[in-house]
Design a protein with these regions (language model features):
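Positively charged, polar, low-complexity stretches
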Residues: 1-83
């Protein structure tokens, strides 16, 4: 099954991470999208590690030199908030 692609190459840098996280947050557990970028999104990986530890998987599908494609999957859900 193919995942939808989120191509951020034409966005200004400050808009990229918020859009990527909104896209991730909208996923159900087990769903994924493919991020398409013009550079290695390794800093984004570290941001996911900090903000979504244990809730995502990260798989490089293509690694440059001009295009990077990364499959990002939601593998769990956030803990329930106390009422």
């Amino acid at each position: 099954m193919s995942q939808p692609e989120l191509d951020v190459r034409n966005l200004i840098p400050r808009e990229r991470h918020p859009l990527i996280f909104r896209t991730f947050d909208a996923l159900a557990a087990g769903e994924a999208f493919v991020l398409v970028n013009d550079h290695d999104p390794k800093p984004l990986y570290y941001q996911f590690q900090a903000e979504s530890t244990g809730r995502f998987s990260w798989e490089y599908l293509e690694q440059g030199p001009e295009v990077w494609r990364v499959k990002i999957e939601k593998v769990g859900s956030a803990p329930a908030k106390a009422q």
